[in-house]
C-alpha cells in the first residue's frame, strides 16, 4: 500500500519502487528464515494457517524467485518502455498470494491466496496494453 501511495504522489518513482520492492523481498526472506529457526510449528486463526519448517522453506524459495524475476525483468521493461510502478507491486501481490497458499490449512484460506495471486497475474498478463497479443493473452487467461 505504501508503494502505491508513493507511486501516486511522486513523479518518476518507478526506479525507487522497484528498488524498494527488491528490498522488501529480501527483508521478508531474512525475517522468514530467522523466525523459522526458533519455532517448530505455529498455528494461527484456529489452525487455518500453519507455519512450519517446510512452509517457511517454500516461502523463502518463492521470495528468492520473485527477487530474481524482478532483477532480471528490469532491463526488459526498460527496453520496451514498460517500466511502470505497477509491475513490482503486482509481483509483490502475487507473491503474497503464493505465501498465503503455502501456509494454508483450510480450503477457504487456500482459495483466498489463489484469488490474490490470480488477480495480480491477470493484470500482469495484459501489462503491455498497446500490443494486441497482450490483450488477447489476458482475455484468454481470465
Name the predicted role of every residue range:
Residues 1-142:
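Alpha-helical transmembrane segments of multi-pass membrane proteins predominantly involved
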